[in-house]
Each structure stands twice: as structure tokens, then as C-alpha cells.
Amino acid sequence: MKIGVFAATVLLCLTGQAAAAPQRIMSLKVCTDELLLDLVQPSRIASVTFLSREKASLRQWPQGASIPVNHGTAEEILATHPDLILADPFIAPALRPLLDKTGAKVVEVPPAENFDQIRSSVRLLAKAVGEETRGEALIARMDATLRDLKAQRPEKTLTVAEWGGGGYVPGRGGLFDALLEAAGARNVEQGSFGYYDVESLIAKNPDALVYGDTYAGTASLRADQDQHPALMKRYAGKRISYAALYGCGVPESADVARQLQDALRKVQK
């Protein structure tokens, strides 16, 4: 009899836990879109940001194409009736009272700028959506990739600049720097960030240039500068394109670091 009561109690607790898992999750920033799509079935996602429909995101998370999108407006938030809202800690102050008014649980997920912070973000979000086992599996896969990268570091440590024609170069302490370190390379900019025109970039003389594909195929002054003849000559065969995915700290960032390592190895040849 006692065993039957205990079993019934456990079943009731498990049923309550399953029912408590959020079923209408709304994401208000692209980086939580990506984590959310990794963690839960699309049927539990009420809305992701419109940025999840960008080509770079759809390449990695094609399931995002079937999910409604939002632009973070008050009207959309109220109309969605979410039971969990994923937001940025730096959300507009005017939105905070509105989020409280929905009655939904709000989880603020800070930007992840290194792999330790990625682990923390995954665990925070996985707990919020009731998918902690899935979260740990994502972390384990990421860590396995990072171990492989460390074991296969290039013989020579190349100096690299992330420069896409805009002039601003991310330095130490950011996500790109963490990706470079994982790939076995060194950031040319040792401050938090730098600004380089074509002449100063050539004077700095990094071994390779890394640039994003965000502006590929579009006309802009930034794109024109990127095609400067001096750069085309100096860095022929030493220009590495990365997907816009690298902008968010997510478990797939380890895969981006692998892509960087493979590309840098080709530069050395």
C-alpha cells in the first residue's frame, strides 16, 4: 500500500513538473532565439525575433522558418500571451512594466562573450525551459569540439584582424577573441577594440584578415573599402570569411572556431 502511495506521489510530481514547463515561449533577442531553437521543440515556441529569418540563422536553425516572428513591440508581446519571455538585461526600460503586466515569467539572458559564459547562458535557459539534460548535452558537445581544437592547434600562431571595411576591430575580451584563442590564433588588437583605416591596418601587418559575410553582395562604402587594391594584393589568399553566426555566444560557436582553425591552416600553406 505504501509503495502504491509513493508511486502515485512520484507520478503526480512528475506530471506537475511536465505541466509546469513553459509551452508559449517568446524570445526578444536573436541570441536567445538560437539557444531556444537548440533546446526545445518548435511547438513550444510562440515567437522568435525577425532576425531568426536571416539567411545565416536559417542555415544553422532551419526550424526557425516555421515559427512566428516578433519585432519586440508592445502590441506583439501582449498579443502573443507568452508564459515565458526571454529578454536581454539591457532591454529598454519602458518595456519592463509591460513585461510585468503580461504575467509571464521573464528570464534575462546576458550576452556571452566567452565559452564559460556560453555554458552559463545555456544552463540558465535550459533550466527556465525545463530542458536541463538537453542543455548539458549541448555543452558536452561544445566542450568536445574545444578539446579537439586544442589538440590540433596550428604549428604557428597567426596574428589575425577581424576587419570588414568598417575600420573597427574587436580586441581582447570579446567573443571573437575567444574564438581566435580556441582556433589557436592571436588577435592583432590587444586593447578592447581598435580602429584601423587601410593604411594603419597594413602597417599593423596581421597574417590574415577575417571578415563577416553580413554585407556580401550589397553596395556600401564599407564594401568598397574592403576591396581596396592594396588589401587585395597584400592579403590575396589570406582573407577568411565567417558566417554572421559568430556574433552570438552559443554552443555552435565552437564549430565556428573549428571553421576558423581550418581556414587559418590553409593560410599557413
How does the language model describe each region?
Residues 1-7:
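Bacterial N-terminal signal peptides that target proteins for export
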Residues 13-17:
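N-terminal signal peptide c-region/cleavage motif recognized by signal peptidases
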Residues 18-22:
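Boundary at the C-terminal end of the N-terminal hydrophobic targeting segment
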Residues 23-24, 28, 116-127, 136, ...:
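Structured C-terminal subdomain patch of bacterial secreted/periplasmic proteins
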Residues 23-40, 133-183:
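Basic- and aromatic-lined ligand-binding clefts that recognize polyanionic substrates
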Residues 24-80, 84-90, 188:
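A short, structured surface patch at a secondary-structure boundary
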Residues 51-56, 63, 169-197:
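Alpha-helical, coiled-coil/dimerization segments enriched in small aliphatic residues
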Residues 94, 111-124, 159-175, 218:
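Extracytoplasmic ligand-binding site segments that recognize negatively charged/polar headgroups
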